[in-house]
Structure formats: structure tokens, C-alpha cells
């Protein structure tokens, strides 16, 4: 079943709104960060990674963002341009705000973490004036990253973008993307997340992220209750992730589709969600069946946790198909598809 119909005549497949960052991942990993001396620099930030992943699948991508007016701002902008991502709405901060920096600590294949520098941060300086009607009118879908809602003026910019998308019939994708370092208290998380989720056609997040979003609405829901609630608002597809236990897509016709992760020798514990988002959306835009979209997204996620970077090593579609074939030959079928009424 085709749950989402995109306006085929629009030039952009997807415009994203959210943070662009710079990741520093150690080359000499499997030791504490304080002992690492050599790092590789990559473009980072969840929506930025999704943008790169989608662009490598041949999708036409645009981006609303603010970045620092310095060499690191040049770095991320030029990387996007090389990937074929439109940067006409990525603008420089004017008051010295800096792009976020992320240092990765990889102690072992089972133990990794990040150290963030986000004081006076550039991405949350995105003002409503940067959000123009033409750009949103010309895209099939708008993806809002939840981190953009953490503070003004980015918060108002994101809400303006959602309002314009509703006016022009642009589909809205909400990637909850909770990052604790950006928020002041849990009430505002629930308030602003739920404002966007009520308008979204697709909602993607972990069980923990849904709990935060629903804290002021009805705490303690299970997945079925969460999906039913957001379907009653506007959502056609609700994806709830459970990490290594897999994820389930709940669709507006009462069906649910569950997929388990592909076995890999993971290097780090993050980056998978960004690959998942890019892969799932590519399948959806391609008109695939829901279980094929999920399988493809899950495969891309598995490949990303085994990779050193989250952006530069985003795989192309043919690489993911080859990975799926090889994995099934070795481990058997991964997808478990249930079609049960909710």
C-alpha cells in the first residue's frame, strides 16, 4: 500500500532543517579519548548525515541551516556541494557563533561515547526569516530534526517551516532526534516535540524519545498506544525503534511491520539511526513495499555502525543491496513482517 503520496512535479525530493556539525573520530581508537592523538574530520549532525545518505541514493536534497562564518563553515558547505546537496539556504552566523564539534571516544566495539562542544552554537541561530515559502513549496517533503526545537530562534524557524509545509501540501517528516545537551527541562521537550508531531505525516524515534514527547500528554504509553494516538492526529507512518531489538513501523491502516538489525561487527554505537532514516526514505520515495523500506533502512543502519564515519562512508544503493544479499546468504531472512490490526 502507498501510505504517502509525494507531489511528483516538485524539484526537490527532501529539504531538511536542523544541525550541521563537525565530527572528530579517533584513528587510534580502542583507548580513552585522552590518550588519542590522531583524528579524522567529518561532517556530522543527524540531519546532515541523513541528507548525505539520501543524496547518495540520487535524491535531490536541500537544507535550511546556520553554520559558523569560518573555515569549518567552509568545510561543511563545500562537502555538501560535492555531494550534490543544495546549499542556497545554508547561511553564515553573523555574531561569532560556532559550529558544533563532536569528539568520539571508542573504548571497544561495545563501548563508545561522544564529547560535545556546543556553547554559543551556530545551528540554533537559524532565524524564521531564513525560512522562505518558495523553498518549501518546491520540495516534496520537509524533514524537521527535533534538536532544532531546543531553543530560539531555531525553534520558531522550525515551526514556521511546518506551518508553510501544511499550507503548501508539503509532506512533513519528524525525526525526533533527542539530544539532552540542548534542552533546559523535560516539559519544553514534550511541548515542542508534540507540536511538530501533530502535523507530521511520518514520525521516527526511539521508545525513549516517544516517552519524552508524550510526557505531558499521557505518560507510560506502550508502542501500540503511541502509534494509535499519532495516527489519530495526522501521521500515516509511525516508526518506533528499540535499538538492538529492532524497530516497528505502524501504519495508518492498522498494520505493523517489524525488522531486526543485520549482524555486523560494530565499531561504534551511533550513526545507525541516520543511515536508517536515509535508507527508509529512499525506499518510500521509490514506491517500495513497507517491509522492503524497513529492511533497506535497517541494512544501511547496520553498515553505518560498522563504519568509522557517519557521513563520508554513507553507502550507495547498490552497496546496500549487495550487503543485504550477502547477509541473507550467511544468516537467513532478517525481516519479520506482521500485518495485525492494532
Language-model segment annotations:
Residues 141, 147-225, 245-246:
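Conserved beta-alpha-beta core of the PfkB/ribokinase-like small-molecule kinase fold
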Residues 1-14, 163, 215-342:
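Conserved phosphate-binding/catalytic region of the ribokinase-like
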Residues 60, 64-144, 321-342:
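Conserved N-terminal subdomain of the carbohydrate kinase-like
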Residues 2-86, 265, 334-342:
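Glycine-rich phosphate/adenosyl-contacting loop at the front of the ribokinase-like
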Residues 55, 81, 163-167, 197, ...:
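Anion (oxyanion) recognition and catalysis
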Amino acid at each position: 500500500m502507498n501510505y504517502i503520496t509525494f507531489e511528483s512535479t516538485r524539484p526537490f525530493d527532501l529539504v531538511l532543517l536542523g544541525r550541521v556539525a563537525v565530527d572528530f573520530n579517533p584513528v587510534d581508537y580502542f583507548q580513552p579519548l585522552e590518550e588519542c592523538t590522531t583524528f579524522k574530520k567529518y561532517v556530522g549532525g543527524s540531519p546532515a548525515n541523513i541528507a548525505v545518505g539520501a543524496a547518495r541514493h540520487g535524491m535531490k536534497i536541500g537544507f535550511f541551516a546556520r553554520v559558523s562564518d569560518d573555515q569549518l563553515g567552509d568545510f561543511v558547505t563545500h562537502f555538501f556541494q560535492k555531494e550534490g546537496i543544495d546549499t542556497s539556504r545554508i547561511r553564515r552566523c553573523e555574531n561569532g557563533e560556532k559550529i558544533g564539534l563532536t569528539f568520539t571516544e571508542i573504548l571497544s566495539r561495545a563501548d563508545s561515547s561522544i564529547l560535545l562542544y556546543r556553547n554559543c552554537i551556530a545551528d540554533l541561530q537559524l532565524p524564521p526569516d531564513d525560512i522562505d515559502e518558495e523553498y518549501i513549496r518546491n520540495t516534496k517533503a520537509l524533514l524537521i530534526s527535533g534538536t532544532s526545537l531546543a531553543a530560539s530562534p531555531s525553534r520558531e524557524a522550525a515551526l514556521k517551516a511546518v506551518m508553510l509545509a501544511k499550507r503548501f501540501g508539503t509532506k512533513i517528516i519528524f525525526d525526533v532526534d533527542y539530544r539532552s545537551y540542548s534542552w533546559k527541562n523535560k516539559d519544553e521537550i514534550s511541548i515542542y516535540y508534540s507540536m511538530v508531531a501533530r502535523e507530521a505525516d511520518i514520525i521516527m524515534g526511539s521508545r525513549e524519545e516517544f516517552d519524552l514527547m508524550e510526557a505531558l500528554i499521557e505518560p507510560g504509553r506502550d508502542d501500540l498506544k503511541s502509534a494509535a494516538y499519532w495516527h489519530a492526529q495526522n501521521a500515516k507512518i509511525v516508526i518506533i525503534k528499540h535499538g538492538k531489538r529492532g524497530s516497528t513501523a505502524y501504519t495508518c491502516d492498522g498494520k505493523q511491520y517489524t525488522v531486526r538489525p543485520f549482524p555486523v561487527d560494530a565499531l561504534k554505537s551511533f550513526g545507525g539511526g541516520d543511515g536508517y532514516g536515509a535508507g527508509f526514505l529512499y525506499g518510500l520515495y521509490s514506491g517500495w513495499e513497507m517491509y522492503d523500506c524497513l529492511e533497506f533502512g535497517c541494512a544501511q543502519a547496520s553498515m553505518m555502525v560498522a563504519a568509522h564515519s557517519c557521513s563520508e562512508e554513507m553507502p550507495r544503493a547498490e552497496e546496500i543491496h549487495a550487503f543485504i544479499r550477502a547477509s541473507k546468504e550467511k544468516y537467513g531472512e532478517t525481516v519479520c513482517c506482521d500485518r495485525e490490526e492494532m
